[in-house]
């Protein structure tokens, strides 16, 4: 091999530096009609380096120095690279590693230029050359990089298990090396660097740890695709931790990934972890700076794009906070409700104390492994966490309200219809959950009225042709809201009245809410009909239960309408019977539907037997009075 200080070797190093510059810097400025111009030039230089290395090798063989790196591997060589073999720091091992490195860079080059088969061939050549060496500080970085690249390549072909194999081998190489050696390993670029330009130990460590961070990131994606969500979350969390520790991250991208990870924890009821991820996301997103003013954004296309990206990603983080608040309230409700779904205040105090003790113990055991941040950011994250409410902790709505405002500001109705409606539905769900904790029935009713005010205008304005499913959701929710308000008003009236007779104002309000609920349930049912208004003979699975429940609710609502006119009362009872009969007859014609509405079917069957008697008595009374 040529001396590291010889002119020949300096020429090789210069070519490598030029190839790196073409790949990493010059390629960014390639014209649209020649998108790979710089990378093709880099490929030519890498090919020349490969030829030079082979010529050095031949020269050494002719002079009798060293075993050629193309000989078969020594017996006993392990598949993962550990075991007996040519040492990584031997001349033959170094030659093989240098040739393998060029194969690696050629492989990446071909993949980048969309020549995947050629790229795979070069990367596998790299793997085969490294099989002739035991893993050492001089080649462990290359061992990991090439398997990372093969993992990415096979994942792109949807060969997830093949990808998994390469990435898990990279992981085991790292862990074994750190256990057996742990010294800062040689970076691949140093194979082609003159002695005076070698990296410091600190920079070597940073690059090596970053390569392993990439391994963990890719494994997180692999496990997610394999449906191993718990392992995927663990690897994702570790990746985010390492990115912060190495100071190698884009603030907004990191923040969005942390916020997304919080959603996994929330669905598992791990609110401490979810809260920590969201607090970290909020703090780190602040490192991206403020969005440019609207005036500045209008003057510069780059500033306009940056403003849009910052606003969008912060709005998406806000939506993740919204989900935290909603899920927290809903899970708290499950813990605190009594047998009829009302707040059990005695149990609330008992469970608050028990849960706080439990949370303290859990946090002591789990939090040390979870923490994000450096000295600069940790205090800010911890401070924000303390301001956010937790399971059974007194409710603080400032974070949640701010999140709704931020999300609505970006996801406006004009241009983001689906997102805007989903945020409104979440806002409605927030008030529904809060109403559970409100003991004042009048205030609880006002909370439900806020939900109506949010949803009703949008529901009526949405185009039924393009947003049919969304309108159905909103119509059903509005029907349920009015139904809840009706029950609350009746309970209030009964509490306040001196006798069992309701005054005219209360009756009018009750009937208005009852009719509004029936109207929206009927709108939902009408949306299932054909354009000619024909009721479907067979209900699709996704609307089967909602449709039958809507029928049952409409029947119940018509029977509850208060009327002083016997003829109007008779008309309402006839309509009620008609809807009860539909539920019973549909389930008789489609036995498989009965399991989806067991309670409603049982009550409908009972009412189909009782209502005709009530109708006949009313008719008889009307006949006598006439």
Region locations from a protein language model:
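Extended alpha-helical scaffold/coiled-coil
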Residues: 1-626
């Amino acid at each position: 091999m040529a001396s590291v200080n010889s002119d020949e070797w300096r020429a090789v190093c210069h070519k490598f530096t030029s190839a790196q510059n073409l790949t990493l810097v010059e390629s960014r400025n390639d014209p649209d009609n020649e998108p790979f111009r710089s990378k093709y030039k880099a490929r030519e230089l890498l090919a020349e380096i490969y030829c030079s290395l082979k010529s050095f090798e031949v020269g050494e063989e002719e002079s009798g120095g060293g075993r050629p790196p193309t000989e078969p591997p020594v017996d006993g060589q392990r598949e993962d690279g550990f075991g007996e073999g040519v040492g990584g720091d031997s001349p033959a091992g170094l030659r093989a590693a240098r040739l393998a490195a060029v194969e690696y860079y050629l492989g990446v080059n071909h993949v980048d230029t969309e020549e995947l088969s050629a790229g795979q061939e070069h990367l596998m050549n790299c793997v085969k050359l490294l099989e002739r060496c035991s893993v050492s500080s001089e080649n462990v970085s290359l061992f990991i990089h090439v398997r990372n690249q093969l993992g990415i390549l096979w994942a792109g072909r949807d060969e997830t298990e093949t990808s998994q194999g390469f990435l898990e081998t990279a992981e085991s190489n790292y862990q074994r090396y750190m256990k057996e050696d742990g010294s800062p390993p040689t970076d691949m670029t140093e194979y082609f660097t003159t002695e005076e330009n070698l990296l410091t130990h600190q920079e070597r460590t940073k690059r090596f740890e970053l390569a392993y961070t990439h391994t963990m990131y890719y494994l997180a994606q692999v496990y997610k695709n394999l449906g191993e969500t718990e392992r995927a979350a663990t690897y994702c969390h570790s990746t985010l931790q390492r990115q912060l520790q190495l100071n190698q991250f884009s603030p907004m991208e990191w923040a969005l990934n942390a916020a997304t990870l919080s959603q996994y924890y929330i669905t598992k009821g791990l609110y401490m972890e979810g809260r920590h991820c969201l607090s970290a996301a909020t703090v780190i997103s602040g490192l991206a700076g403020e969005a440019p003013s609207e005036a500045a954004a209008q003057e510069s296309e780059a500033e306009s794009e940056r403003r849009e990206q910052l606003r969008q990603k912060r709005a998406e983080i806000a939506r993740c906070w919204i989900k935290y608040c909603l899920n927290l309230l809903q899970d708290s409700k499950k813990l605190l409700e009594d047998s009829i779904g009302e707040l059990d205040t005695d149990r609330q105090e008992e469970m608050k104390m028990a849960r706080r003790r439990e949370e303290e113990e859990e946090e002591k055991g789990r939090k040390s492994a979870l923490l994000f941040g450096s000295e600069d950011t940790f205090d800010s994250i911890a401070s924000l966490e303390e301001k956010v409410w937790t399971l059974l902790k007194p409710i603080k709505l400032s974070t949640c309200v701010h999140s709704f405002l931020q999300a609505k500001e970006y996801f406006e109705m004009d241009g983001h219809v689906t997102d805007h409606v989903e945020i409104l539905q979440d806002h409605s769900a927030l008030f529904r959950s809060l109403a559970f904790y409100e003991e004042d029935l009048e205030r609880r009713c006002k909370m439900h009225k806020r939900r109506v005010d949010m949803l009703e205008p949008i529901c009526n304005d949405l185009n039924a042709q393009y947003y049919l499913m969304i309108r159905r959701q909103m119509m059903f929710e509005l029907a349920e809201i009015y139904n809840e308000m009706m029950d609350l008003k009746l309970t209030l009236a009964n509490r306040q009245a001196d006798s069992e007779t309701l005054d005219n104002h209360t009756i009018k309000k009750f009937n208005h809410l009852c009719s509004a609920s029936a109207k929206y349930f009927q709108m939902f049912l009408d949306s299932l009909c054909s354009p000619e208004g024909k009721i479907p003979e067979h209900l699709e699975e996704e609307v089967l239960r909602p449709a039958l429940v809507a029928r049952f609710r409409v029947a119940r609502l018509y029977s509850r309408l208060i009327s002083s006119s016997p003829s109007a009362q008779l008309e309402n009872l006839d309509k009620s019977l008609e809807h009860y009969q539909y539920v019973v007859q549909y389930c008789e014609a489609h036995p498989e539907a009965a399991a989806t509405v067991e309670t409603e079917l049982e009550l409908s069957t009972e009412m189909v037997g009782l209502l005709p008697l009530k109708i006949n008595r009313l008719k008889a009374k009307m006949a006598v009075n006439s």
